[in-house]
Amino acid sequence: MPPLHLGLILPNYGERLDVERLVGTALAAEEAGFDSGWVTDHLLAPPEHAGIYGSIAEPLVSLGFLAARTTRLQLGVSALVVPQRNPLVVLKQLTTLDFLSKGRIVTAVAAGWMENEFALLGADFEHRGRTLNEWLRVAASAFEQMPGLLRFDSGEGWLAPALVRPGGPELWVAGISPQTLRRAALTGVWHPVALPPDELRPMLEELRTRRPDSRVIPRVSAYFQDEPRRGVDERGRYAVAGPPEWIAERLAAYVDVGCDGFVVNLDYDAPGLEDRLWRFAEQVVPSLGN
């Protein structure tokens, strides 16, 4: 069995947003042995969501900054809302990040859920799924053609520099809808968010009937507390809460249903994040047999 992939949600948003805290967390994650660090995406949070997303650093700019400060850590967005952006500009940004990071970009993409944000940006919410489907097709074609003159439906153009990572930045698909599973079968990696193992299992099995070699790496919130319980994250979704051995047991349940790793949110906006990531690395990861 390959080693579990261990990613960490980095604090690029929240009341405690601070550049040194963001960089320090990424460097600590790299030193502690995490495989990847992930920022979160929102561009313009409407007032009703400002309590969580009102203070957020743009994710792709953040990845470029973090790429210059780290050396080994893979860097990604969980998850990049492609339909809110110019699709070819996104390709240019991701391939440039691949170049700047020396091939360390791996990112999840999603159709998005915040309708008012789409309205603020003048983006098409109703057809966002169709937009993402088309972008995935274009991205796959572009990565195959690079370097050189690329042919798009709208014409021809150069998308340089050449790719560092063979095949281009690794694309995961985030979400929990049936459409998400169809997209994940194309890219090969599914990134569900806030699903308990028992709800994830049938969807995982369906995905692997479509593509047996698919990897599944969920985003899971895990909070250190004295007493074990079913917790909730900042948006009221499923989370794991308890002492280290309980968290390890709950995460092992994901492995038991077929997951290939996790991207963990260790309460990104609370004080002491670096202490928690070290505690996770030293007291939880060894129990997972990784």
Where are the language model's segments positioned?
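Active-site-adjacent structural elements that line small-molecule/cofactor binding pockets in enzymes
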Residues: 1-290
